[in-house]
């Protein structure tokens, strides 16, 4: 195993995604790997939780919510893609992906600011609103 430095927001994001995978994936072998990674990363996050449990859980809940929405949206898009159904629903869902990714980035940025992360994620996209 290698260890890397990452932003606090990225750590929270990864833990939230692993929590979702733990709920959604049924393959036993995959679940073993997911659980191992989740435990490892959660141990790294314990210090952050001890700083302010309420904020920790709030950030995590918000990331789980937006990442669950992304998971469900992308599942639906894949079904439409498989059926070659490039209709209005497909367009709405495709747009939802980047709207929700923008929300996800905002939450991760808030986490980074709250915990004064030395490493931060930066993005730049064409403005659409």
Task: Give residue spans per PLM region.
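Extended, charge-rich alpha-helical interface modules
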Residues: 1-129
């Amino acid at each position: 195993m290698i260890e890397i430095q990452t932003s606090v927001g990225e750590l929270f994001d990864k833990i939230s995604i692993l929590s979702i995978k733990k709920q959604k994936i049924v393959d036993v072998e995959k679940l073993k790997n997911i659980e191992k990674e989740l435990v490892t990363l959660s141990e790294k996050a314990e210090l952050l939780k001890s700083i302010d449990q309420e904020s920790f859980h709030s950030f995590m809940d918000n990331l789980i919510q937006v990442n669950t929405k992304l998971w469900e949206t992308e599942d639906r898009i894949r079904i439409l893609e498989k059926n070659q159904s490039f209709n209005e629903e497909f367009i709405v869902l495709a747009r939802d992906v980047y709207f929700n990714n923008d929300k996800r980035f905002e939450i991760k940025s808030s986490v980074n600011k709250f915990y004064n992360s030395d490493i931060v994620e930066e993005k730049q996209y064409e403005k659409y609103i």
